[in-house]
Amino acid sequence: VNPISGGGSALKEAKKIDSFAKQEKLDYEVYYTKCERDAYNFVKNYKGKKVIFHSLGGDGTVNEVASAVMDTDNYLSIIPNGSGNDFYRTIRKTALIEFKCDICRINDRYFINVASVGLDADVAKNSYLMKDFKIPRKQIYNFAIFNYPIFCINNYDTSYKFIIQRNPLL
């Protein structure tokens, strides 16, 4: 559970799920992330066991859990509760139960939704940097887009190097 996703509403959802799981006497554990890559590190501890990880958070939390279940017998379940939930919105109509999806890697990091450079990546980064500003959480992304020219004046780098390896898909 990413406790800050969805403006903190993930905590409310986690309490509902916890109550249901106790009532049904399910074998489960609720883990609350504390920082970036925490979900990844937690899930990696279960390599070699067959576990279903329910990712309660946004796209970042889903990405960390998906990256950690790679090359294991574990499964990823998504309970969307972020500000955008782009990956879930993309797959929700076709993925009601179980499906396989493409996953890609850049250097040592996997991604299942989007990897981008330029404007989109800069806006996402600036949105993250602005999370503590006194701006309504649902408006931070729009504010970052509007202020993109201001953010990039001193930090603009147009050089990128791409190397495409033709390895078989995972």
Feature locations, PLM:
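Catalytic core of DAGKc-family lipid kinases
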Residues: 24, 33, 72-169
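Gly/Ser/Thr-rich loops at beta-strand to alpha-helix junctions
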Residues: 6-7, 58-60, 85, 119
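Acidic active-site catalytic centers that drive phospho-/nucleotidyl reactions
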Residues: 2, 59, 100-102
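ATP/NTP phosphate-donor binding region
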Residues: 1-53, 63, 67, 71
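Glycine-rich beta-strand-to-loop/alpha-helix junction loops that act as flexible
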Residues: 3, 56-58, 79-81
